[in-house]
Swiss-Prot record:
PANTHER family: INORGANIC CARBON TRANSPORTER SUBUNIT DABA-RELATED, UPF0753 PROTEIN AQ_863. It comes from Ruegeria sp. (strain TM1040). The keyword Cytoplasm does not apply. It comes from the Bacteria. One of its GO terms (molecular function) is zinc ion binding. It holds the Pfam family DabA. It is a peripheral membrane protein. Part of an energy-coupled inorganic carbon pump. This is Probable inorganic carbon transporter subunit DabA. It is found in: Cell inner membrane.
Amino acid sequence: MFAKLETYPAALLELVATANDAAKAIPPLFPLSSSVAVNPFLGQTEEPLAVTAARLARVGGTKIMPERAHWAAKLEAGDITETDLTEALAALKGRFNCPSLDDVKAALTVPSPTPQALPTVAELAADVSGLDWPALIEDRISAWAAGHFDEGQALWQQAKTGGTFSAWRDFAARDLTPEIQGLSGFCAFVAATNRSHWRAIGRASERLNLGTEAASTAFHRWLMTLGGWAQYGRYLLWQDELNGAQNSTVTELLAIRMVFDEALFALYEDQISARWAEVVAAHQTPVTPTPDLVIDAIWQDAAERAEQRRLAETLQSGAVQPVEGRAEVQAAFCIDVRSEVFRRALEAQDRQIETLGFAGFFGLASAHKAAGSDVVETRGPVLLQAGVSSQAKEAEELDLDRRYSARAKRAWGRFKLAAVSSFAFVEASGPLYAGELIRDSLLLGGKTKAEPAPALDPSISLATRIQMAKTVLTAMSLTSDFAKLVVLAGHGADVTNSPHESALQCGACGGHAGDVNARLLAALLNDRDVQKGLRDQGIEIPSDTVFLPALHHTTTDEVTLYEQDLSSYALQISEATRGKLKGWLTEAGRLARAERAQRLPRASSEASVHMRARDWAETRPEWGLAGCRAFVAAPRARTSGADLGGQAFLHNYVWQRDEGFGVLELILTAPVVVASWISLQYYGSTVAPAQFGGGNKLLHNVVGGIGVLEGNTGAPRAGLPWQSVHDGDKVQHDPLRLSVVIEAPREAMSEILSRHPGVRALFDNGWLHLIAMDDEGKLAWRYRGDLKWSRFDAPQSTPSALAAE
């Protein structure tokens, strides 16, 4: 990503730094095989919503807050009160020129203005020529990029030596399409560019009269026109930065885009130079929100405060006493909001059932190889590097069978895509799929054989395993009072014929199901040598406690128990409890499906919920995390009696057991951040689907194994498809920024935020809300930013409510 600084003049070095900053303003697009939720505002977390709204209006013509009719409806329904509005208005004072309360309310009668991005040279040239130059540029870059970035879908791979810009330069110098469309001499123009993409950026900037101040948002603007290609380049940069390496793909793509505009400027300079000078002058001005954007930000904050009031009431009415004595079953689920519905249903089966919430990778981020495969899957959060390696091993004969089957499947896939056979494939082979289609539609298919148990490979020392087990149990607030049976339930989704399948899997497991992580941890905790080591460190696991790995299928609310992983002794001592558990899980699944069916279109029966997982044409097999709005880290007793509607991330946390607040620090810096990415992806895909959404599933075509096109051309679409947030009648996700509720001392949270400026920025700039719960389970304190707090129930305009830490 970084240039060799000693080889460039000072003026170019300033542009290099600006280009690198622009690259980081773009969110990453993870490939379909390991797709995870990404915060579309990742590069803007250092500024508040209103400023980001102004920035994205300038560089993308993007509106990132709901229409005012949305808030007007909430106000009329009583969901937003005048108190909410007054507090939101008071909270914004000092940052911007704030309007009066009357002005804020009056604004609802007028639609907010539609933002217009500053035009590129290509758009100005299109205006004077009548030729759609932006579309041509998108088409030619996409035609090249689809092959250049291909991850195995294409039969013929492009050469990738020399870097992204160099590869495009070789392609474009021979691509006659722009010249045929009227961009005369373009091939020669490209051939004359320097092979250094930094030199190309420098030359184009000079030719277009771009100084450093104007380049900041101008570079961002050009990258926005590249859509998913720039975002995939940002993913490559993200991955290399995790490994301490460098990557210049995004800035090389910027150079490619600028070369097009440089060539167009040379062709149309006489007609557009005056207008382009105005654009450059506009890029030089500071990014400042308009009064309309400030008003919209106030309404957004008011809606979130209203939701926090309702959350406080729900939690107060739902608090229950914890299980007395030893629980018969403890079931640990991922904090994913989909688990909340099932946990509530399971706890309703018997008072001796206790559920826990923890990040779905269960503290073991693993670089994993499935049985019969050499492909390494990162089964952990994208924020972390894998801490261990694992592999699912089986007998050599079975391993070879899997490999031969996989090769045959790949060969069949290549036959489908080959230049000649692809034309006749549907007519010749379509009938072969009829049986499979009928079988799946009637739910007659057999269950997929479970993977063999994963094991750490290479193995690690006993001392390391003991420390790992202690760390995980401490983070789960599970260091005493173990039940007879402790279920460790990862989660995964069962969907058919969906390019976005990995987006419904466990985000904490890198877009994979959580079965591997659950099975690894269960094996670790069932190890008698590990238990002895834990006992020496003060964690006593009873001799009759068994850890049972499981997988919660979120599409069907069924649970797979990996009993085959247990020893004969563990099977024997847990037989009676496992028998009860299976009955409880069956009934809990029935209740959970009935609750979820109320939101799902055409889900009138329990069978129809199952059918969605196997239906090849189903665009909404489940709602995923649509509706997520809160994150609660507290003892389960604070939430177990509350119906949170499958809209809250629930993390077990007992601060009194957290010596030094290391677990609290982990929660704030890892699962809270991951949850914010999820929440803001749903937010962005709902309020700005054209920019941050994945488009219409019915029009999707996979490109390069990276992402999807909407149609057969253009750039990959990032974010969630429209069907993932909209039921055909109304949106299923209320665009609210996440409210994080933690039962812990404010001083400890402030101290942690002071050590992590990136996390603090999320709260200081309002991308997340932070609320402290007191020891009675009440929402007591609200984080105000700048390490200051105010009482949750106090009007925000009351100075005496402030408490600096």
